[in-house]
């Protein structure tokens, strides 16, 4: 009997991930990547801004005050952008299109940051802020829409999703 119970417990553990909709894992990795992007920017933005303009790893050579000002605006605007991003999703685009658009804008923003021109830097930051504004307020509600309201898997699904958020944040730090 004990052997049978052990087998059932193992079987239950290995199948838990197969019980969830496939869309959960797409959203898991999307949010992991977005949080890696956000916390990665938070980790290196000020360092890049205050680094000397020449040398092995050139930056923009800003003062610490200027760098902290931009960092503050970036952080505030990322979360403020979620308000119009959510409204546009609710009234015009829908959640799915908003998440896709947000991810696309994030990619463009990071590509623009790779170009060594100040105008591309500001454009990249702008695309990232707008991208997060579309993605962040909508992706969590998409996770919820994968499950029936009273599904026992719904809570597990959100836990898996939040694990992705934490992995992304941890990896970026």
Annotate the PLM regions.
Residues 109, 120-135:
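Hydrophobic core of transmembrane alpha-helices in multi-pass small-molecule transporters
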Residues 43-66:
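Short amphipathic helix-loop junctions that connect adjacent transmembrane helices
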Residues 68-89, 136, 170:
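Central cavity-lining transmembrane alpha-helices of secondary-active solute carriers
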Residues 78, 155-173:
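Glycine-rich segments within core transmembrane alpha-helices of 12-TM secondary carriers
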Residues 91-103, 150, 154:
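Cytoplasmic membrane-interface "Motif A"-like loop-to-helix N-cap segments
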Residues 101-122:
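C-terminal ends and interior cores of transmembrane alpha-helices
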Residues 134-148:
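Intracellular juxtamembrane helix-capping segments at the cytosolic ends
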Residues 2-39:
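Cytosolic juxtamembrane N-terminal segment immediately preceding the first transmembrane helix
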């Amino acid at each position: 009997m004990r052997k049978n119970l052990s087998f059932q417990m193992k079987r239950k553990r290995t199948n838990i991930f197969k019980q969830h909709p496939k869309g959960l894992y797409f959203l898991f990795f999307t949010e992991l990547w977005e949080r890696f992007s956000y916390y990665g920017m938070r980790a290196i933005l000020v360092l890049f801004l205050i680094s000397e303009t020449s040398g092995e790893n050139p930056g923009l050579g800003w003062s610490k005050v200027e760098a902290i000002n931009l960092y503050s605006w970036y952080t505030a605007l990322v979360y403020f952008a979620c308000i119009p991003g959510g409204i546009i999703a609710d009234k015009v685009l829908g959640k799915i299109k908003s998440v896709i658009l947000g991810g696309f804008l994030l990619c463009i923003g990071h590509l623009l940051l790779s170009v060594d021109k100040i105008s591309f830097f500001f454009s990249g930051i702008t695309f990232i802020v707008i991208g997060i504004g579309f993605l962040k307020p909508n992706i969590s509600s998409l996770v919820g829409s994968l499950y029936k309201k009273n599904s026992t898997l719904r809570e597990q699904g959100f836990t898996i999703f939040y694990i992705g958020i934490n992995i992304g944040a941890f990896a970026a730090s």
